[in-house]
Amino acid sequence: MKKKISEQEIIRHQKMNELKKINIDPFGKKIVPSHSIKQIILQYQKEDSLAFEQSQINVCVAGRIVLKRGQGKAGFLHLQDFDFRIQAYVKLDLVGKDAFQIYQNCDLGDIIGIKGFLFKTKTQELTIKALEFIHLTKALKPLPDKFHGLQNREDMRKKRYVDLIVNEKTRQVFLTRSLIMKYIRNFFDNQGFLEVETPILQPTLGGASAKPFITHHNALNCDFYLRIATELPLKKLIVGGMNKVYEIGRLFRNEGIDATHNPEFSTIEAYLAYADMQDIMDLTKQCLQELVQKIFGKLQFTYQNQEIDFSHFAKVSMVASIKEKTGIDFTDHFTLEQCLSLAKKHKIEVMPHFSQGHIIEAFFGKYVENALIQPTFVYGHPLEISPLAKQNEFDPRFTDRFELFIVGKEFANAFRELNDPIEQEKRFLNQLKQKQLGNEEANDMDYDFLNALNYGMPPTGGLGMGIDRLVMLLTDTANIRDVILFPHCKNQNKFI
């Protein structure tokens, strides 16, 4: 099937051929800019006209044409690199007839180079007066116009390269994402953690409760999982004597897509030997407060019209939060039958593998989670839903585990790590029973991890934190796919 081509594209192809006729490569050669547009703006924007008259400041820049105006023997254009743009003035008498002809024929979206000097117009706009106009790349497709192009969010996600060109908001989101990644990495480096890399392809499913992607390793002739967590390999490194480790990377969960879930997502996981749950809580709070302070210059900001305050992190047990909303006290020793009866009364769906702990979690999800707007540590998760966490010393039905909730969503999951290999094996066996009852998110038996624990793992605290949701929060973005450069979309590989 022959692809359709618009009238504008036909004209642009003709212009490409015209460039070839005069021995100009439509797709350009190397240029060495003296400055980025950002450097020019930051360095010279505040200078007055007199400064440019007293000393000629020569520059060479490259960028994409995003605006063009003027007729006759002179005109203006705006060049954009990524996060900054600058005006250029192109005049026939200065650049010469041949170069001016190329300027007249150029289109929005073309990439060009300008050599010239800086001045300020009568309206005090910083401008480059062109002495040379250099064609670099012909854009064969037109950019969407300001009012009618790329209005559909799904189109923006499919064609992120166009979205980045035309939408400043998108550019700012991904610049901020890069800063967030850098700040997080610097924080853990400065705390003395060692950054490591662990395999994406895993022979055993474990480290979290999730449905996996499965692939086949031809050379080894066996199936592998795309990792759903980095937890177990990182804890093996704790056994090996790496007492402070972290990894920033991609995880994969073969589950649904919605505003806060994407099957491929980024996390940081960090593990600290000789630490407990409170230590990890303090570490998480310090990391996030420093991050918010660096992004906003203060600890308060707005997300989706809600004022969020990071100066204080609340702390509440899971069962206490449920009691506050429902009056039900799950610290009472309810039987499974009593819990099932309560679930039925409160119209909570129950799966065949559900235990008391699963029902407690379901109550929390229905009555509490969405109401946790300000930063809140929720601790004391039931044992049955926490197969890798250590039991609480005072009530072994619960664990020394916490999750961080903000704006009604989970942002971090952490616990005092279970380091007893005998107890861990029992937990894995229970997970296998849950899988037989239909729990698709249950873990496998990881014999190598058990073997590692038998060599002795020191008391350890661990943290997993989602980076994409953090970027959403700190850029006031409502959908997770708008903070991922190339999210998965339907019909993504069509030529459009």
Swiss-Prot record:
InterPro entries (alphabetical): Aa-tRNA-synt_II (IPR004364), aa-tRNA-synth_II (IPR006195), aa-tRNA-synth_II/BPL/LPL (IPR045864), Lys-tRNA-ligase_II (IPR002313), Lys-tRNA-ligase_II_N (IPR044136), Lys-tRNA-synth_II_C (IPR018149), NA-bd_OB-fold (IPR012340), NA-bd_OB_tRNA (IPR004365)
Annotated GO CC locations: cytosol
Alphabetized CDD domains for the sequence: LysRS_core, LysRS_N
Alphabetized UniProt keyword annotations: Aminoacyl-tRNA synthetase, ATP-binding, Cytoplasm, Ligase, Magnesium, Metal-binding, Nucleotide-binding, Protein biosynthesis
Catalytic activity: tRNA(Lys) + L-lysine + ATP = L-lysyl-tRNA(Lys) + AMP + diphosphate
Lineage: superkingdom: Bacteria
Binding residue positions for Mg(2+) 2: E410
Subcellular location: Cytoplasm
Chief subcellular location: cytoplasm
Enzyme Commission number(s): 6.1.1.6
Necessary cofactors: Mg(2+)
Subunit (UniProt): Homodimer.
Similarity comment text for this entry: Belongs to the class-II aminoacyl-tRNA synthetase family.
Protein name stated in the entry: Lysine--tRNA ligase
Organism whose genome encodes this protein: Aster yellows witches'-broom phytoplasma (strain AYWB)
